Protein backbone atom coordinates (compact mmCIF):
# COMPACT_ATOMS: atom_id res chain seq x y z
CA UNK A 1 0.00 0.00 0.00
CA UNK A 2 1.39 3.42 -1.04
CA UNK A 3 1.76 6.05 1.71
CA UNK A 4 1.97 9.79 1.16
CA UNK A 5 5.36 11.18 2.24
CA UNK A 6 6.04 14.90 2.32
CA UNK A 7 8.31 16.10 -0.46
CA UNK A 8 11.55 17.94 0.21
CA UNK A 9 9.93 21.22 -0.88
CA UNK A 10 7.03 20.73 1.52
CA UNK A 11 9.41 20.05 4.39
CA UNK A 12 11.31 23.23 3.58
CA UNK A 13 8.08 25.25 3.58
CA UNK A 14 7.12 23.85 7.00
CA UNK A 15 10.55 24.70 8.41
CA UNK A 16 10.36 28.20 6.94
CA UNK A 17 6.93 28.83 8.43
CA UNK A 18 8.05 27.47 11.80
CA UNK A 19 11.10 29.75 11.74
CA UNK A 20 8.97 32.78 10.93
CA UNK A 21 6.58 31.94 13.76
CA UNK A 22 9.44 31.65 16.27
CA UNK A 23 10.93 34.96 15.10
CA UNK A 24 7.55 36.67 15.45
CA UNK A 25 7.15 35.33 18.98
CA UNK A 26 10.65 36.45 19.94
CA UNK A 27 10.30 39.88 18.34
CA UNK A 28 6.86 40.50 19.80
CA UNK A 29 8.42 41.67 23.08
CA UNK A 30 9.93 45.03 22.19
CA UNK A 31 10.88 45.99 25.75
CA UNK A 32 14.35 47.56 25.67
CA UNK A 33 16.59 45.65 28.04
CA UNK A 34 18.30 48.88 29.08
CA UNK A 35 15.07 50.30 30.53
CA UNK A 36 14.43 47.16 32.56
CA UNK A 37 17.99 47.20 33.89
CA UNK A 38 17.67 50.86 34.83
CA UNK A 39 14.29 50.12 36.46
CA UNK A 40 16.01 47.53 38.63
CA UNK A 41 18.65 50.10 39.58
CA UNK A 42 15.97 52.68 40.40
CA UNK A 43 14.02 50.19 42.52
CA UNK A 44 17.13 49.14 44.42
CA UNK A 45 18.20 52.73 45.09
CA UNK A 46 14.68 53.70 46.14
CA UNK A 47 14.50 50.77 48.54
CA UNK A 48 17.86 51.67 50.07
CA UNK A 49 17.03 55.36 50.41
CA UNK A 50 13.54 54.54 51.70
CA UNK A 51 14.95 52.31 54.42
CA UNK A 52 17.59 54.92 55.25
CA UNK A 53 14.87 57.59 55.49
CA UNK A 54 12.80 55.44 57.84
CA UNK A 55 15.82 54.73 60.06
CA UNK A 56 16.86 58.39 60.04
CA UNK A 57 13.40 59.58 61.08
CA UNK A 58 13.27 56.97 63.86
CA UNK A 59 16.73 58.06 65.05
CA UNK A 60 15.66 61.72 65.25
CA UNK A 61 12.46 60.79 67.08
CA UNK A 62 14.35 58.61 69.56
CA UNK A 63 16.91 61.35 70.19
CA UNK A 64 14.14 63.89 70.82
CA UNK A 65 12.21 61.57 73.13
CA UNK A 66 15.42 60.56 74.91
CA UNK A 67 16.19 64.20 75.66
CA UNK A 68 12.70 64.65 77.10
CA UNK A 69 13.04 61.53 79.24
CA UNK A 70 16.15 63.03 80.84
CA UNK A 71 14.09 65.93 82.24
CA UNK A 72 10.80 64.05 82.76
CA UNK A 73 10.89 64.72 86.51
CA UNK A 74 11.18 68.48 86.02
CA UNK A 75 7.95 69.86 84.57
CA UNK A 76 9.35 73.39 84.31
CA UNK A 77 11.98 72.00 81.89
CA UNK A 78 9.94 69.27 80.20
CA UNK A 79 7.23 71.41 78.60
CA UNK A 80 9.49 74.18 77.21
CA UNK A 81 12.01 71.62 75.98
CA UNK A 82 9.30 69.60 74.21
CA UNK A 83 8.17 72.75 72.40
CA UNK A 84 11.68 73.97 71.54
CA UNK A 85 13.03 70.66 70.24
CA UNK A 86 10.05 69.99 67.98
CA UNK A 87 9.95 73.62 66.84
CA UNK A 88 13.63 73.62 65.86
CA UNK A 89 13.34 70.33 64.00
CA UNK A 90 10.27 71.52 62.12
CA UNK A 91 11.92 74.84 61.25
CA UNK A 92 14.80 72.98 59.62
CA UNK A 93 12.36 71.24 57.29
CA UNK A 94 10.38 74.37 56.46
CA UNK A 95 13.52 76.45 55.86
CA UNK A 96 15.15 73.92 53.53
CA UNK A 97 11.99 73.58 51.47
CA UNK A 98 11.33 77.28 51.14
CA UNK A 99 14.94 78.25 50.50
CA UNK A 100 16.18 75.53 48.17
CA UNK A 101 13.34 73.42 46.72
CA UNK A 102 9.75 74.69 47.09
CA UNK A 103 8.50 71.68 45.10
CA UNK A 104 9.68 69.45 47.97
CA UNK A 105 6.98 70.85 50.26
CA UNK A 106 3.91 68.85 51.12
CA UNK A 107 3.41 65.30 49.96
CA UNK A 108 5.33 65.51 46.69
CA UNK A 109 2.95 63.13 44.93
CA UNK A 110 1.23 65.92 42.94
CA UNK A 111 4.70 67.04 41.82
CA UNK A 112 5.39 63.57 40.43
CA UNK A 113 2.03 63.59 38.65
CA UNK A 114 2.87 66.96 37.12
CA UNK A 115 6.33 65.76 36.10
CA UNK A 116 4.82 62.74 34.33
CA UNK A 117 2.91 65.20 32.16
CA UNK A 118 6.03 67.33 31.65
CA UNK A 119 4.33 70.20 33.49
CA UNK A 120 6.53 70.32 36.60
CA UNK A 121 10.33 70.30 36.83
CA UNK A 122 12.31 67.48 38.39
CA UNK A 123 15.36 69.02 40.04
CA UNK A 124 16.60 65.89 41.72
CA UNK A 125 19.88 67.48 42.84
CA UNK A 126 17.82 69.83 45.02
CA UNK A 127 14.80 67.74 45.94
CA UNK A 128 16.64 64.62 47.13
CA UNK A 129 18.66 66.25 49.96
CA UNK A 130 15.90 68.73 50.86
CA UNK A 131 13.15 66.11 51.05
CA UNK A 132 15.33 63.67 52.96
CA UNK A 133 16.73 66.09 55.54
CA UNK A 134 13.58 68.22 55.70
CA UNK A 135 11.45 65.11 56.22
CA UNK A 136 13.78 64.00 59.00
CA UNK A 137 13.08 67.32 60.70
CA UNK A 138 9.31 67.49 60.36
CA UNK A 139 8.59 63.80 60.96
CA UNK A 140 11.21 63.63 63.69
CA UNK A 141 9.49 66.56 65.40
CA UNK A 142 6.38 64.42 65.87
CA UNK A 143 4.26 66.28 63.32
CA UNK A 144 1.17 64.54 61.96
CA UNK A 145 2.70 63.51 58.65
CA UNK A 146 3.55 60.28 56.86
CA UNK A 147 6.73 59.12 55.18
CA UNK A 148 5.02 57.76 52.05
CA UNK A 149 4.88 61.15 50.30
CA UNK A 150 8.61 61.77 50.73
CA UNK A 151 9.55 58.26 49.59
CA UNK A 152 7.32 58.52 46.50
CA UNK A 153 8.86 61.86 45.53
CA UNK A 154 12.36 60.65 46.41
CA UNK A 155 11.80 57.53 44.30
CA UNK A 156 10.60 59.55 41.31
CA UNK A 157 13.57 61.88 41.58
CA UNK A 158 15.95 58.92 41.85
CA UNK A 159 14.43 57.66 38.61
CA UNK A 160 15.24 60.96 36.91
CA UNK A 161 18.72 60.96 38.46
CA UNK A 162 19.47 57.51 37.03
CA UNK A 163 18.18 58.69 33.66
CA UNK A 164 20.55 61.67 33.69
CA UNK A 165 23.55 59.75 35.03
CA UNK A 166 23.27 57.12 32.30
CA UNK A 167 22.32 59.75 29.68
CA UNK A 168 19.15 58.08 28.49
CA UNK A 169 17.50 60.68 26.28
CA UNK A 170 14.28 59.05 25.11
CA UNK A 171 10.97 60.45 26.34
CA UNK A 172 9.78 56.91 26.99
CA UNK A 173 12.68 56.18 29.35
CA UNK A 174 12.20 59.52 31.10
CA UNK A 175 8.53 58.86 31.76
CA UNK A 176 8.96 55.18 32.64
CA UNK A 177 11.78 55.59 35.17
CA UNK A 178 9.97 58.45 36.90
CA UNK A 179 6.86 56.29 37.34
CA UNK A 180 8.99 53.31 38.38
CA UNK A 181 10.67 55.32 41.13
CA UNK A 182 7.33 56.59 42.43
CA UNK A 183 5.85 53.07 42.60
CA UNK A 184 8.99 51.73 44.26
CA UNK A 185 8.79 54.59 46.78
CA UNK A 186 5.29 53.68 47.90
CA UNK A 187 6.29 50.03 48.16
CA UNK A 188 9.32 50.99 50.26
CA UNK A 189 7.20 53.11 52.59
CA UNK A 190 4.52 50.52 53.34
CA UNK A 191 6.05 47.15 52.39
CA UNK A 192 3.17 46.91 49.92
CA UNK A 193 4.45 46.00 46.44
CA UNK A 194 1.08 45.39 44.80
CA UNK A 195 -0.28 48.65 46.20
CA UNK A 196 2.73 50.46 44.73
CA UNK A 197 1.91 49.09 41.29
CA UNK A 198 -1.81 49.85 41.60
CA UNK A 199 -1.06 53.36 42.85
CA UNK A 200 0.65 54.21 39.58
CA UNK A 201 -2.02 52.55 37.45
CA UNK A 202 -5.00 53.95 39.36
CA UNK A 203 -4.08 57.22 41.09
CA UNK A 204 -1.77 58.40 38.29
CA UNK A 205 -3.88 56.98 35.47
CA UNK A 206 -4.28 60.37 33.71
CA UNK A 207 -0.51 60.79 33.61
CA UNK A 208 0.86 57.23 33.39
CA UNK A 209 1.44 56.00 29.82
CA UNK A 210 0.45 52.38 30.20
CA UNK A 211 2.24 50.03 27.80
CA UNK A 212 4.20 46.80 27.98
CA UNK A 213 7.48 48.63 28.50
CA UNK A 214 6.33 50.94 31.27
CA UNK A 215 4.39 48.34 33.25
CA UNK A 216 7.26 45.82 33.13
CA UNK A 217 9.62 48.50 34.36
CA UNK A 218 7.26 49.39 37.22
CA UNK A 219 7.00 45.72 38.19
CA UNK A 220 10.79 45.38 38.12
CA UNK A 221 11.37 48.47 40.24
CA UNK A 222 8.76 47.50 42.81
CA UNK A 223 10.18 43.98 43.10
CA UNK A 224 13.67 45.30 43.79
CA UNK A 225 12.42 47.93 46.23
CA UNK A 226 10.39 45.35 48.16
CA UNK A 227 13.32 42.93 48.32
CA UNK A 228 15.57 45.65 49.75
CA UNK A 229 12.92 46.64 52.30
CA UNK A 230 12.44 43.05 53.47
CA UNK A 231 16.18 42.40 53.72
CA UNK A 232 16.47 45.20 56.28
CA UNK A 233 13.06 45.10 57.97
CA UNK A 234 11.85 41.52 57.60
CA UNK A 235 8.63 40.25 56.05
CA UNK A 236 6.18 40.95 58.86
CA UNK A 237 3.32 43.39 58.12
CA UNK A 238 4.15 46.90 59.25
CA UNK A 239 0.85 47.23 61.15
CA UNK A 240 0.27 44.40 63.61
CA UNK A 241 -3.43 44.05 64.34
CA UNK A 242 -3.51 40.26 64.49
CA UNK A 243 -5.71 37.94 62.46
CA UNK A 244 -9.27 39.22 62.53
CA UNK A 245 -12.36 37.11 61.97
CA UNK A 246 -14.13 37.21 58.64
CA UNK A 247 -17.28 39.30 58.22
CA UNK A 248 -20.48 37.19 57.99
CA UNK A 249 -22.62 37.82 54.93
CA UNK A 250 -25.56 39.12 56.99
CA UNK A 251 -23.35 41.94 58.36
CA UNK A 252 -22.06 43.24 55.02
CA UNK A 253 -24.75 45.94 54.87
CA UNK A 254 -23.07 47.60 57.84
CA UNK A 255 -19.90 48.02 55.79
CA UNK A 256 -21.92 49.75 53.11
CA UNK A 257 -23.26 52.13 55.76
CA UNK A 258 -19.69 52.75 56.88
CA UNK A 259 -18.74 53.46 53.28
CA UNK A 260 -21.57 55.99 53.03
CA UNK A 261 -20.24 57.76 56.12
CA UNK A 262 -16.76 57.97 54.65
CA UNK A 263 -18.23 59.06 51.33
CA UNK A 264 -19.50 62.14 53.16
CA UNK A 265 -16.35 62.64 55.23
CA UNK A 266 -13.92 62.42 52.28
CA UNK A 267 -15.07 65.50 50.31
CA UNK A 268 -15.37 67.52 53.54
CA UNK A 269 -11.83 66.54 54.49
CA UNK A 270 -10.50 67.56 51.06
CA UNK A 271 -12.26 70.91 51.27
CA UNK A 272 -10.78 71.55 54.70
CA UNK A 273 -7.28 70.72 53.41
CA UNK A 274 -7.59 73.21 50.55
CA UNK A 275 -9.09 75.97 52.68
CA UNK A 276 -6.40 75.52 55.31
CA UNK A 277 -3.78 75.82 52.57
CA UNK A 278 -5.36 79.11 51.51
CA UNK A 279 -5.39 80.32 55.10
CA UNK A 280 -1.67 79.64 55.52
CA UNK A 281 -0.89 81.26 52.17
CA UNK A 282 -2.69 84.43 53.22
CA UNK A 283 -0.80 84.41 56.51
CA UNK A 284 2.77 84.15 55.27
CA UNK A 285 2.29 85.50 51.75
CA UNK A 286 5.36 83.62 50.56
CA UNK A 287 7.67 85.39 53.02
CA UNK A 288 10.27 82.89 54.21
CA UNK A 289 10.63 84.28 57.73
CA UNK A 290 6.90 84.09 58.46
CA UNK A 291 6.69 80.67 56.85
CA UNK A 292 9.51 79.19 58.93
CA UNK A 293 8.24 80.74 62.19
CA UNK A 294 4.76 79.44 61.43
CA UNK A 295 6.18 75.96 60.83
CA UNK A 296 8.14 76.14 64.06
CA UNK A 297 5.02 77.06 66.00
CA UNK A 298 3.10 74.12 64.49
CA UNK A 299 5.97 71.74 65.18
CA UNK A 300 6.30 72.99 68.76
CA UNK A 301 2.59 72.52 69.37
CA UNK A 302 2.87 68.94 68.10
CA UNK A 303 5.70 68.41 70.57
CA UNK A 304 3.49 69.65 73.42
CA UNK A 305 0.57 67.61 72.14
CA UNK A 306 2.77 64.52 72.20
CA UNK A 307 3.08 64.97 75.96
CA UNK A 308 -0.60 65.67 76.59
CA UNK A 309 -2.17 63.16 74.19
CA UNK A 310 0.46 61.04 72.42
CA UNK A 311 -2.18 59.43 70.19
CA UNK A 312 -2.96 62.81 68.62
CA UNK A 313 0.61 63.40 67.39
CA UNK A 314 2.90 61.56 64.99
CA UNK A 315 2.10 59.76 61.74
CA UNK A 316 -0.35 57.34 63.34
CA UNK A 317 1.20 53.90 62.76
CA UNK A 318 1.57 53.35 66.50
CA UNK A 319 -2.00 54.49 67.09
CA UNK A 320 -3.67 52.16 64.57
CA UNK A 321 -3.14 48.81 66.40
CA UNK A 322 -4.16 50.34 69.74
CA UNK A 323 -7.36 51.82 68.33
CA UNK A 324 -8.25 48.74 66.27
CA UNK A 325 -7.95 46.56 69.38
CA UNK A 326 -10.82 48.48 70.99
CA UNK A 327 -8.76 49.99 73.80
CA UNK A 328 -10.63 53.31 73.60
CA UNK A 329 -14.27 54.17 74.18
CA UNK A 330 -16.39 55.50 71.34
CA UNK A 331 -16.30 58.98 72.82
CA UNK A 332 -12.51 58.96 73.15
CA UNK A 333 -12.12 57.61 69.62
CA UNK A 334 -14.21 60.46 68.24
CA UNK A 335 -12.28 63.00 70.33
CA UNK A 336 -8.94 61.71 69.04
CA UNK A 337 -10.39 61.66 65.52
CA UNK A 338 -11.37 65.34 65.69
CA UNK A 339 -8.05 66.28 67.28
CA UNK A 340 -6.08 64.47 64.61
CA UNK A 341 -8.16 66.03 61.84
CA UNK A 342 -7.11 69.44 63.15
CA UNK A 343 -3.45 68.49 63.54
CA UNK A 344 -3.38 66.81 60.12
CA UNK A 345 -4.78 69.94 58.51
CA UNK A 346 -2.27 72.18 60.28
CA UNK A 347 0.75 70.02 59.50
CA UNK A 348 -0.01 68.96 55.93
CA UNK A 349 -1.65 72.14 54.64
CA UNK A 350 1.17 74.33 55.94
CA UNK A 351 3.50 72.86 53.32
CA UNK A 352 5.70 70.77 55.60
CA UNK A 353 7.65 68.04 53.79
CA UNK A 354 5.62 64.96 54.62
CA UNK A 355 2.79 62.79 53.37
CA UNK A 356 -0.88 62.50 54.25
CA UNK A 357 -1.44 58.77 53.58
CA UNK A 358 -0.48 57.62 57.08
CA UNK A 359 -2.55 60.31 58.85
CA UNK A 360 -5.55 59.39 56.68
CA UNK A 361 -5.13 55.71 57.50
CA UNK A 362 -5.13 56.58 61.21
CA UNK A 363 -8.22 58.77 60.83
CA UNK A 364 -10.02 56.00 58.97
CA UNK A 365 -9.10 53.53 61.70
CA UNK A 366 -10.44 55.79 64.46
CA UNK A 367 -13.77 56.45 62.77
CA UNK A 368 -14.12 52.85 61.60
CA UNK A 369 -13.47 51.48 65.08
CA UNK A 370 -15.94 53.92 66.64
CA UNK A 371 -18.57 52.81 64.12
CA UNK A 372 -17.81 49.13 64.79
CA UNK A 373 -18.09 49.53 68.56
CA UNK A 374 -21.38 51.40 68.24
CA UNK A 375 -22.72 48.78 65.83
CA UNK A 376 -21.72 45.99 68.24
CA UNK A 377 -23.86 47.62 70.94
CA UNK A 378 -26.82 48.25 68.62
CA UNK A 379 -26.73 44.78 67.02
CA UNK A 380 -25.48 42.33 69.67
CA UNK A 381 -26.93 39.38 67.74
CA UNK A 382 -24.24 39.81 65.06
CA UNK A 383 -21.32 39.39 67.49
CA UNK A 384 -19.39 42.09 65.63
CA UNK A 385 -15.66 42.66 65.94
CA UNK A 386 -14.74 46.35 65.91
CA UNK A 387 -11.34 45.59 64.41
CA UNK A 388 -12.86 44.52 61.09
CA UNK A 389 -14.52 47.93 60.77
CA UNK A 390 -11.21 49.55 61.67
CA UNK A 391 -9.55 47.78 58.75
CA UNK A 392 -12.38 48.76 56.40
CA UNK A 393 -12.22 52.35 57.59
CA UNK A 394 -8.46 52.55 56.99
CA UNK A 395 -8.92 52.24 53.27
CA UNK A 396 -12.27 54.00 52.99
CA UNK A 397 -11.11 57.52 53.83
CA UNK A 398 -8.23 57.24 51.40
CA UNK A 399 -10.58 55.89 48.73
CA UNK A 400 -13.01 58.78 49.21
CA UNK A 401 -10.32 61.46 49.43
CA UNK A 402 -7.74 60.35 46.87
CA UNK A 403 -10.32 58.51 44.71
CA UNK A 404 -8.19 55.38 44.49
CA UNK A 405 -10.30 52.53 45.94
CA UNK A 406 -8.23 49.66 44.56
CA UNK A 407 -5.04 51.11 45.99
CA UNK A 408 -6.74 51.70 49.33
CA UNK A 409 -8.06 48.14 49.49
CA UNK A 410 -4.81 46.41 48.56
CA UNK A 411 -2.62 48.76 50.61
CA UNK A 412 -4.52 48.06 53.83
CA UNK A 413 -4.67 44.31 53.23
CA UNK A 414 -0.93 44.15 52.56
CA UNK A 415 -0.08 46.33 55.56
CA UNK A 416 -2.22 44.33 58.01
CA UNK A 417 -2.06 40.84 56.45
CA UNK A 418 -5.84 40.40 56.75
CA UNK A 419 -6.66 39.34 53.20
CA UNK A 420 -9.81 37.53 54.33
CA UNK A 421 -11.47 40.94 54.76
CA UNK A 422 -11.28 41.77 51.07
CA UNK A 423 -15.07 41.61 50.53
CA UNK A 424 -16.05 44.08 53.29
CA UNK A 425 -13.12 46.26 52.18
CA UNK A 426 -14.44 46.34 48.62
CA UNK A 427 -17.96 47.20 49.78
CA UNK A 428 -16.78 49.99 52.10
CA UNK A 429 -14.25 51.55 49.73
CA UNK A 430 -16.49 51.35 46.67
CA UNK A 431 -19.41 52.85 48.58
CA UNK A 432 -17.20 55.66 49.86
CA UNK A 433 -15.80 56.40 46.41
CA UNK A 434 -19.15 56.42 44.62
CA UNK A 435 -20.82 58.68 47.16
CA UNK A 436 -17.85 61.06 47.23
CA UNK A 437 -18.04 61.32 43.46
CA UNK A 438 -21.82 61.80 43.58
CA UNK A 439 -21.40 64.64 46.08
CA UNK A 440 -19.00 66.40 43.72
CA UNK A 441 -15.78 65.71 45.59
CA UNK A 442 -12.56 65.96 43.60
CA UNK A 443 -9.48 63.75 44.06
CA UNK A 444 -7.14 65.45 46.52
CA UNK A 445 -3.84 65.07 44.68
CA UNK A 446 -5.30 66.11 41.32
CA UNK A 447 -6.82 69.20 42.90
CA UNK A 448 -3.54 70.17 44.57
CA UNK A 449 -1.71 69.70 41.26
CA UNK A 450 -4.25 71.88 39.44
CA UNK A 451 -3.78 74.63 42.02
CA UNK A 452 0.00 74.36 41.73
CA UNK A 453 -0.15 74.63 37.94
CA UNK A 454 -2.51 77.61 38.14
CA UNK A 455 -0.08 79.34 40.51
CA UNK A 456 2.82 78.48 38.20
CA UNK A 457 0.99 79.95 35.19
CA UNK A 458 0.11 83.11 37.14
CA UNK A 459 3.74 83.59 38.19
CA UNK A 460 4.93 83.04 34.63
CA UNK A 461 2.38 85.53 33.28
CA UNK A 462 3.45 88.12 35.84
CA UNK A 463 7.09 87.54 34.92
CA UNK A 464 6.34 87.94 31.22
CA UNK A 465 4.49 91.20 31.87
CA UNK A 466 7.34 92.62 33.94
CA UNK A 467 10.07 91.80 31.41
CA UNK A 468 9.12 94.41 28.73
CA UNK A 469 8.67 97.06 31.42
CA UNK A 470 12.18 96.40 32.69
CA UNK A 471 13.62 96.60 29.18
CA UNK A 472 11.93 99.95 28.48
CA UNK A 473 13.35 101.70 31.52
Curated annotation (Swiss-Prot):
The UniProt record lists the keyword ATP-binding: no
Single GO MF descriptor: antiporter activity
Superkingdom in the source lineage: Bacteria
Span(s) of short sequence motif Selectivity filter part_2: 146-150
InterPro entries the UniProt entry points to: Cl-channel_ClcA (IPR023861), Cl-channel_core (IPR014743), ClC (IPR001807)
Annotated binding of chloride, by residue: 107, 356-357, 445
Keywords: Antiport, Cell inner membrane, Cell membrane, Chloride, Ion transport, Membrane, Transmembrane, Transmembrane helix, Transport
SUPFAM superfamilies xref list: Clc chloride channel
Cleaved signal peptide residues: none
GO cellular component terms, A-Z: plasma membrane
Main location: membrane
Motif (Selectivity filter part_1) on chain: 106-110
Subunit structure: Homodimer.
PANTHER family associated with the record: CHLORIDE CHANNEL PROTEIN (PTHR45711:SF6)
Known function: Proton-coupled chloride transporter. Functions as antiport system and exchanges two chloride ions for 1 proton. Probably acts as an electrical shunt for an outwardly-directed proton pump that is linked to amino acid decarboxylation, as part of the extreme acid resistance (XAR) response.
Protein name: H(+)/Cl(-) exchange transporter ClcA
Organism field: Salmonella arizonae (strain ATCC BAA-731 / CDC346-86 / RSK2980)
Organismal lineage: Bacteria, Pseudomonadati, Pseudomonadota, Gammaproteobacteria, Enterobacterales
Annotated gene: clcA
Amino acid sequence: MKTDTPTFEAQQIVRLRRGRLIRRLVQRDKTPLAILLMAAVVGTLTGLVGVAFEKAVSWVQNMRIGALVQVADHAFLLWPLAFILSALLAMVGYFLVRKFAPEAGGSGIPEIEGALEELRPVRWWRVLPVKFIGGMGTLGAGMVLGREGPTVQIGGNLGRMVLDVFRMRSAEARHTLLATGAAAGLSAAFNAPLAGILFIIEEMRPQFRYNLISIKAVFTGVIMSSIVFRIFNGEAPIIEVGKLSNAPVNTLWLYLVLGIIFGCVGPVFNTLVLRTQDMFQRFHGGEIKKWVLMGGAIGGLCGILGLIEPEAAGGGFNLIPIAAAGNFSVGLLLFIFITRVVTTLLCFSSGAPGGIFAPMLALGTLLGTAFGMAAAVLFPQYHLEAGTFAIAGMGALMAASVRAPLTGIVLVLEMTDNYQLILPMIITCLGATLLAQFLGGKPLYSTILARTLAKQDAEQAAKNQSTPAGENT
